[in-house]
């Protein structure tokens, strides 16, 4: 708002100066300035709730929200009441439409907890219109975090978000960009290329963005690459998104992020093979970055668990193994400093990752379960509550397990003079205890463990289902289904 105010104040000063100097301003330019004021202070609101209509998908996820609306774009629709409910169909000749869904060359998607700067669309659509960008399907600015976070966990989670912003910028160079999902400008023609038509009962559903996983934007990025489309990260901070303020809501978000990558990586390998047969090989840089993006949570979580649990001795823990990790931590500390954080925050992020270890492992195991059972899981939205969101007992218990186990290893290795592993175990115990205190809270963790234990002992009593009362057939039932009594009488006793 302040940027817009400065812009308008500058325009006012320029107009006053032209009057003082008695200079002529073109009438068309004056008209443009008036139109700009009208557009700034005029807003039109309209909403569309897909579940009000029986002709749209019933799936409860963000992907189907987008698919339902995009599938209706460019159509003039009529509301029609049927026995299944209200449906939307295309208008027929000489009918007046109830809805006119305008078509567009571009689609802007935005999460509910995200905000865009005022020149977001202006800059990104301008880039899409430049010569040579005809095959760019998605352009985005991976969101940044809001400054001045009031809690420690929100600040560290924001630091990891800002580092991801920089990582995504580098992925564009290797044509390995992933659609992040919180915001993007998408070319409608690219969505039409990846559209899949299916049926849900009696409904015909157009799926542009696959909902097989809860990270639907990642899978759509792979689909677009197969059809020769490219994705671009615009190198500016034009979007901002809220970070979960407490550990309970962060668990929901990070567990969702950890789920789905292993399912999509198989599809990526199939597309790599298909592109090879077409003579359009995937370059090594793109291949490595995409595989790392989809599978890094899985292998880093299992690797960290192995490092915490395995009893190393002096023969395995050589100085070269320790030095191999220094470039990673040096680069991360440099990125943190560039984003306005402290270099020492790498230790806080390390503790943050240990606290979230069980969350990431559960998301990874859920992906494996989905792959084995070929099922979908519901989209879990990040809670937005005034008070603290309670955490499942498992996720607040495991940091205590890590602390106790690390202390035991430190005690045992100290007496056996295994100094390398003793130092590592002691460091893990200290960092994890600090992270538990700062990010969860000792009292809050005890509360959540007690509540989880009580819930484990008590099973909620299900209310008995009442027998369905047969209602009198309406005129719609008679027209669409005929005599229901014949059906009841023909059933065996």
Per-segment meaning from a language model:
Residues 244-259, 345-346, 372-386:
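Nucleotide-sugar-dependent glycosyltransferase catalytic core
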Residues 289-374, 390-467:
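Membrane-embedded multi-pass helical conduit in multi-pass membrane proteins
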Residues 1-273:
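Internal catalytic domains of large membrane-associated glycosyltransferases
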Residues 11-34, 365-395:
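Multipass alpha-helical transmembrane domains of eukaryotic endomembrane proteins
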């Amino acid at each position: 708002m302040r940027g817009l105010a400065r812009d308008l104040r500058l325009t006012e000063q320029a107009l006053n100066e032209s009057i003082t100097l008695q200079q002529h301003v073109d009438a068309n330019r004056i008209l443009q300035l008036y139109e700009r004021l009208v557009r700034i202070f005029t807003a039109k609101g309209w909403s569309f709730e897909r579940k009000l209509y029986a002709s749209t998908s019933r799936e409860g996820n963000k992907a189907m929200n987008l698919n339902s609306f995009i599938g209706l774009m460019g159509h003039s629709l009529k509301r029609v009441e049927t026995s299944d409910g209200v449906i939307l169909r295309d208008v027929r000749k000489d009918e007046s439409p109830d809805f006119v869904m305008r078509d567009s060359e571009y689609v802007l998607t935005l999460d509910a907890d995200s905000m865009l700067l005022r020149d977001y669309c202006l800059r990104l659509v301008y880039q899409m219109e430049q010569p040579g960008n005809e095959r760019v399907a998605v352009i985005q600015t991976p969101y940044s975090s809001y400054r001045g976070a009031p809690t420690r966990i929100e600040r560290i989670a924001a630091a990891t978000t800002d580092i991801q912003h920089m990582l995504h910028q580098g992925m564009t160079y290797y044509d390995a960009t992933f659609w992040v999902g919180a915001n993007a400008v998408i070319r409608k023609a690219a969505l039409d290329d990846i559209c899949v038509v299916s049926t849900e009962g009696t409904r015909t559903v157009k799926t542009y963005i696959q909902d097989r996983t809860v990270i639907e934007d990642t899978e759509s990025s792979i689909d677009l690459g197969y059809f020769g489309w490219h994705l671009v990260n615009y190198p500016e901070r034009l979007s901002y998104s809220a970070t979960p303020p407490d550990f309970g809501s962060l668990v929901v978000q990070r567990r969702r992020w950890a789920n789905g990558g292993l399912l999509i990586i198989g599809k990526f390998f199939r597309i790599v093979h298909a592109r090879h047969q077409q003579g359009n090989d995937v370059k090594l840089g793109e291949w490595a970055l995409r595989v790392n993006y989809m599978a890094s949570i899985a292998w880093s979580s299992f690797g960290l668990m192995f490092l915490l649990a395995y009893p190393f001795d002096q023969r395995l823990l050589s100085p070269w193994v320790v030095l191999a990790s220094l470039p990673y931590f040096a680069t991360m500390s440099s990125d943190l400093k560039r984003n306005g954080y402290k270099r020492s925050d790498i230790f806080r992020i390390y503790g943050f990752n240990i606290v979230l270890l069980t969350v990431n492992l559960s998301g990874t195991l859920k992906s494996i379960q989905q792959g084995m059972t070929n099922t979908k899981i519901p989209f879990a939205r990040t809670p937005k509550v005034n008070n603290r969101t309670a955490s499942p007992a498992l996720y607040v218990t495991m940091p205590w397990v890590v602390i106790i186990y690390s202390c035991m290893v430190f005690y045992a290795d100290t007496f056996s003079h295994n100094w390398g592993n003793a130092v590592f175990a002691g460091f893990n115990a200290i960092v994890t205890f600090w992270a538990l205190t700062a990010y969860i809270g000792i009292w809050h963790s005890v509360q959540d463990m007690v509540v989880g234990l009580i819930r484990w002992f008590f099973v909620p009593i299900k209310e008995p289902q009442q027998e369905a009362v047969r209602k009198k057939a309406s005129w719609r039932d008679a027209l669409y289904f005929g005599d229901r009594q014949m059906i009841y009488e023909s059933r065996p006793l």
